[in-house]
Amino acid sequence: MLELEHIQKSFDGVPVLKDISLQVADGEIVSILGPSGCGKTTLLNLILGIVDADSGRICYDGQDLTRTPMEKRGFNIVFQDYALFPNLNVLQNITYGLRNKPGISTKEEVEELIDLLGLREHLSKRIDQLSGGQKQRVALARTMVMKPKILLLDEPLSALDGVIKESIKDRIKTIAREYHLTTIIVTHDPEEALTLSDRVLIIEQGTISQYAKPEEI
C-alpha cells in the first residue's frame, strides 16, 4: 500500500500542495484529475521522487520513502512524450533498462510483455515509423520489463484518439490486473479518469476535493 501523510509542497513560497493525505491499495488504478496548475503533476513527481516534499511522509508497504532517492524507490514512470530513444529500434527500446539490470526480467517475461502489448510485428521498426498508440505501448513495455512496484503514467492518452485511446485504456487495465500493479495516472480528462480507474483523486488549488470510486464522484 502507498500512503501519503500530510504532504506539503511550495515553489518560491507559493503553496502547490496543501496537506495531502491518501492511501492507494496494491493493484489499484487511481487517476489524479484536475485543471492545469492544480498540483497533480507535482504530486506525481513527489511519489516518483523527482522532487521532495517540504513536510509530510510518503510510505510504501510500511517503509518511509520520504527521503529515499528516486532510483531506490522502485517506482517507474511513462512520460507524456514517451521519452523513447530514436536511434534504437522497438526491441532495443524495450530492453534498454535491462543493460544495467540484466536479471530483473527473464527472456520469457519480456516476450510475454511484447505479446501482451501487441508489439511482436513492430520489434525491428524505428521509433519514427510508429503511430502514437504504438509508441505508448513501447513505452509501457520498456517500463514494465523493469518490474516497477508502482506504475506512474503522465497524461498517457492525451495525444491519442478514438479506437487507439480505448485500446491503450484496455491495455493499462490488463497490466494492472495481470501484474497486480498499483497504477497512478495524471489526467485532465474526466471521462478518461472515470472509465479507467478504481478510484479518482480530484485536486483543486492544491487540496483534495474528492477521493472516491468513479460511481461516487
Where are these regions (language model features)?
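Conserved ABC ATPase "signature" region
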Residues: 105-122, 173-174
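A short, proline-enriched helix->beta-strand linker immediately N-terminal to the Walker B motif
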Residues: 145-149
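The feature captures the beta-strand-to-loop junction immediately N-terminal to the Walker
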Residues: 33-35
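ABC ATPase "signature
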Residues: 211-212
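Conserved ABC ATPase signature
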Residues: 126-130, 134
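ABC ATPase NBD coupling module
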Residues: 64-79, 100
